[in-house]
Amino acid sequence: VYHNHTLLHDDLMDRSDVRRGKPTVHKVWNDNTAVLSGDAMLILAFRYMTGCPPEHLKEVMDLFSLTTLEICEGQQLDMEFESRCDVTEDEYIEMIRLKTAVLLAGSLKIGAILAGATAEDAENLYNFGMHIGVAFQLQDDLLDVYGDPEVFGKKIGGDILCNKKTYMLIKALNRADEKQHAELNRWLNAEAFQPSEKIEAVTEIYNQLNIRNICESKMREYYTFAMESLAAVAVAEDRKKELKNLVKLLMYREMSVSYTHLRAHETLRHL
């Protein structure tokens, strides 16, 4: 419920028209409906959290509250980056850690707390979720440029059109020669353009600079960090099967989005 709250507000702020292959709430209804629906989901999420066992309630609510604040901070950074041309790789990784990764990390740690895990195992699960969350967002950046819209569930090139300072754009700006840098800046500063032309031009520069492979390499790096954290959790390997299946669903989005989303939901429900 909380995750859907963030998506409703995120789509509104980004003016995204499609989510999971369907029109977004503010497109079907209006902006006010999207804001109020998202707010209601946030309230419901906190209400559900109060159903935790009393002995864990304070620790769970503290972590959940911190997570929600961090996600707001990440979204604010994401919006600020759109008007900046000097965003660094480290700043971007920190932004996606806050905006995306801490939600998965916090969810896993809350589950560990409620299951009576040791503090060390709970922290290892948190780190597992955080690293997978970063890898997932890097993959999301990649799919926004190179994905199939039928599989991705969103229009391709949205990040390019709104000048999102993604890992790919940051790397391209750092690696570009004088001519490529000027071309990128021309598109970043253009006020009137054909969307398809801008997407094609920026993607071509990414291709020239091997940005796709660079992004995939960084994604695999965080995937490796995540699996190392999962390996450190002191439970039998067969008990980690569902988490490994979840990782496969998140990191290999090759099936239809609706089916992948359903399987991910079922996996989380049975953890």
What role is predicted for each listed range?
Residues 1-181, 185, 221, 248-251:
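Mg2+-dependent prenyl diphosphate-binding active-site environment of isoprenoid biosynthetic enzymes
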Residues 7-8, 230, 243, 268-271:
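Generic leucine side-chain signal with a strong bias for well-ordered alpha-helical environments
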Residues 55-56, 116-120, 175-179, 193-194, ...:
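Alpha-helical structural elements of signaling/regulatory helical domains
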Residues 103, 218, 233, 256-258:
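Alpha-helical, largely C-terminal catalytic domains
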Residues 169, 226, 243:
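Hydrophobic, well-ordered secondary-structure elements that form the walls
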Residues 176, 182-233:
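Mobile late-domain/C-terminal helix-loop "cap" segments
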Residues 222, 238-258:
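Short, amphipathic C-terminal "tail helix"
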Residues 260-270:
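Conserved small/polar residues in nucleotide/adenosyl-binding loops
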